[in-house]
């Protein structure tokens, strides 16, 4: 990709558990993403997330101009005062300039901070940066919040991996509502670690959701872990197929509920969103 795009600025947002089937480990993912740093060499610029432990380890190999961004650790482009509004969208200060986002989720606050940082590296005016980020909206099926008849649906079903699942669950916890419902499916391309990674997500669901509905072979591990973490059989349910799960949620939704819908793209969870919003 570097040879095709020929970037002059490279950005490392995070290094996580996506595509482990192909890279085998987080270290393998780090090695692949680190190829961007190798390409940049000594004459080009790397912008990296100072709050991501694996990224920080990986950037030790960079030889060129290294710039950092983040909300927690000291960095050249440090976001301050991060708060989320009623839609879960981040508002923060960067070098005392207010940034307001229309994309929900704490993880997207990092994306917004990185984008603003790149703008400043390229000498874009603050007003232009603020306007552009305030106007940018999520694309379909990526942290897309839809409201209908008192129901809030977080449509995040374009794809899923363990890190994005955890980020979506955090968003579910941040959006106000009467009941928090996680409607989740399999995360694919995780290789031999798939069972353990689904279980880790299930344990987190128990801390963020009132109800877990799941379907898919691997999601049985997710439901089992949620039950082990404290959810009972009425709170954490597994369904044999998507249609049965869709029928259940359609019959049991209430005004004020917040429903997160997320799975790997091949699970076709967009069908669930369509059913919920009918």
Predicted regions and their residues:
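Acidic, Mg2+-coordinating active-site environments of NTP-dependent enzymes
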Residues: 2, 6-152, 177-178, 203, ...
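Short beta-strands and strand-loop turn motifs
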Residues: 11-17, 49, 155, 181-186, ...
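Short, glycine/acidic-enriched loop or turn micro-motifs at the edges of active sites
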Residues: 17, 52, 158-160, 189, ...
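Glycine/threonine-rich flexible loop motifs
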Residues: 20-27, 165, 191-194, 269-271
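Active-site beta-alpha connecting loops in nucleotide-dependent enzymes
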Residues: 139, 157, 161-231
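ATP-dependent carboxylate/acyl-activation modules
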Residues: 140-142, 266-274
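Short acidic-hydrophobic, aromatic-tinged amphipathic segments that line or gate anion-handling sites
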Residues: 235-245
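Short amphipathic alpha-helix with an adjacent loop that forms part of the alpha/beta core around
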Residues: 245-252
């Amino acid at each position: 990709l570097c040879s095709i795009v020929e970037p002059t600025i490279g950005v490392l947002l995070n290094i996580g558990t996506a595509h482990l089937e192909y890279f085998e480990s987080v270290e393998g993912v780090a090695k692949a993403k680190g190829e961007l740093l190798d390409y940049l060499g000594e004459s080009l610029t790397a912008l990296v997330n100072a709050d991501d432990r694996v990224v920080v380890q990986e950037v030790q190999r960079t030889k060129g101009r290294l710039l950092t961004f983040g909300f927690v650790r000291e960095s050249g482009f440090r976001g301050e005062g991060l708060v989320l509004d009623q839609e879960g969208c981040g508002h923060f200060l960067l070098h005392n300039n207010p940034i307001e986002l229309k994309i929900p989720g704490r993880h997207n606050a990092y994306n917004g901070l990185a984008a603003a940082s790149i703008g400043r590296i390229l000498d874009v005016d603050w007003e232009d940066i603020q306007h552009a980020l305030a106007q940018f909206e999520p694309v379909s099926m990526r942290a897309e919040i839809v409201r209908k008849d008192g129901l809030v649906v977080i449509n995040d079903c374009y794809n899923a991996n363990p890190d994005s699942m955890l980020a979506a669950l955090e968003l579910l916890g941040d959006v106000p509502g009467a009941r928090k419902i996680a409607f989740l499916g399999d995360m694919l391309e995780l290789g031999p670690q798939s069972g353990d990674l689904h279980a880790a997500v299930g344990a987190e669901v128990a801390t963020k959701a009132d109800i877990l509905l799941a379907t898919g072979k691997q999601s049985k591990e997710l439901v089992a872990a949620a039950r082990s973490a404290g959810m009972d059989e009425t709170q954490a349910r597994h369904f044999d197929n998507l249609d049965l799960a869709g029928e259940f949620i359609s019959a049991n939704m209430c005004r004020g509920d917040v429903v997160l819908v997320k799975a790997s793209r091949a699970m076709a969870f967009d069908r669930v969103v369509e059913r919920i919003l009918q």
